Amino acid sequence: MADHEVWDCERRFWLDSGNFYKEQVAPDAVLVFPIVGIVDRAAGLAWTRKTPRWTQVAFSNRIFSYAAETAVLAYEAHAEAAKTAHAYYACCSSTYVRVRESWMLIAHQQSALANIEQQLTERGALSVFFNS
């Protein structure tokens, strides 16, 4: 099993549009984000469509685990958005399940490694979520 397929999916979740999210997130997915909290697929998709996308992301301290058509990723992320000079740092984990020929995200969790309110406010994401 080549882990690069799953890591490529993960990178696209950070960088691509809401269309990728809509296609690759499982219907019953559970997502956990700083400030926002626990959300389902619909709420996650709505938030993704309203917030500026990241323009760069780097993963470090990567861990990959695979068993029975399920893949788990754990890593530290460093992301940057085009509209700000500020970076976002988080510890993350994602769980994917293989459905036919593609990987579907079933769970994702982020824990910010710095002041999350400041990070999201600078990116414009905090006001987008709470003013929707």
Q: What residue ranges belong to the model's regions?
A:
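A beta-strand edge to alpha-helix "cap/lid" segment located at domain peripheries
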Residues: 1-24, 28-132
